[in-house]
Curated annotation (Swiss-Prot):
Keywords: Hydrolase. This is Acylphosphatase. It comes from the Bacteria. Its EC number is 3.6.1.7. GO terms for molecular function: acylphosphatase activity. The keyword ATP-binding does not apply. InterPro entries: Acylphosphatase, Acylphosphatase-like_dom, Acylphosphatase-like_dom_sf, Acylphosphatase_CS. It comes from Streptomyces coelicolor (strain ATCC BAA-471 / A3(2) / M145). The gene is acyP.
Amino acid sequence: MSEDVRLVAWVRGQVQGVGFRWFTRARALELGGMSGFALNLGDGRVQVVAEGPRERCEGLLEWLRGDDTPGRVDGVTEIWDTPRGGYEGFAIR
């Protein structure tokens, strides 16, 4: 079993107003074992915070960078950290 981690990703491109946060939540729930949120930022990016097993978070990051996301992703910047907890489920903020 892999260690639990915290993934914080900032997704840029045409990612607001296209259902991106909803689909991100759906993908996180489909992968399972993660908690966190997806949030629209004022500069047009979407911030995704996910905590859970490393392989699940890596799967979510791979999806964020893939061609199956709604809208258009121009790039994803991520940082990895230790989990902080405090999330229940995966929310859209």
